Amino acid sequence: MTSTPGATPPASSLDPAVAARLKRGADGLVPAIAQQYDTGEVLMLGWMDDEALHRTLTTGRCTYWSRSRQEYWVKGDTSGHVQHVKSVALDCDADTVLVKVDQTGAACHTGDRTCFDADALPLGK
């Protein structure tokens, strides 16, 4: 399903009280960090608009907005690497979403467990 983020969502969309708190970027999106609920492992960063957050909250599966494909995607629908939502929270500025999930398989499209496994940067001395 394709749509434009930030466009007027359907009437059944995100709770207005939650929507009023969100601080979105100019593109209508907020960063969404997926974290393994029981280990604290940071898995990936995706993007959500109001509709993606609504779907995540109501279906129990993470829905993201693909900036490259300009469409919604549910993590695991293609790969089988599903993110089952355990909790969702806003940060103190309400400009980032933390989604605690139970990750099945790899979180990264490369096949790695997380999107942060492959490219650790050296620290200066």
Swiss-Prot record:
GO terms for cellular component: cytoplasm. The keyword Secreted does not apply. Its EC number is 3.5.4.19. Pathway: Amino-acid biosynthesis; L-histidine biosynthesis; L-histidine from 5-phospho-alpha-D-ribose 1-diphosphate: step 3/9. Its main location: cytoplasm. Zn(2+) binds at residues 92, 108, 115. It comes from the Bacteria. Binds 1 Mg(2+) ion per subunit. Its cofactor is Mg(2+); Zn(2+). It is found in: Cytoplasm. Mg(2+) binds at residues 91, 93, 95. Homodimer. Belongs to the PRA-CH family. This is Phosphoribosyl-AMP cyclohydrolase. It comes from Streptomyces griseus subsp. griseus (strain JCM 4626 / CBS 651.72 / NBRC 13350 / KCC S-0626 / ISP 5235). The gene is hisI.
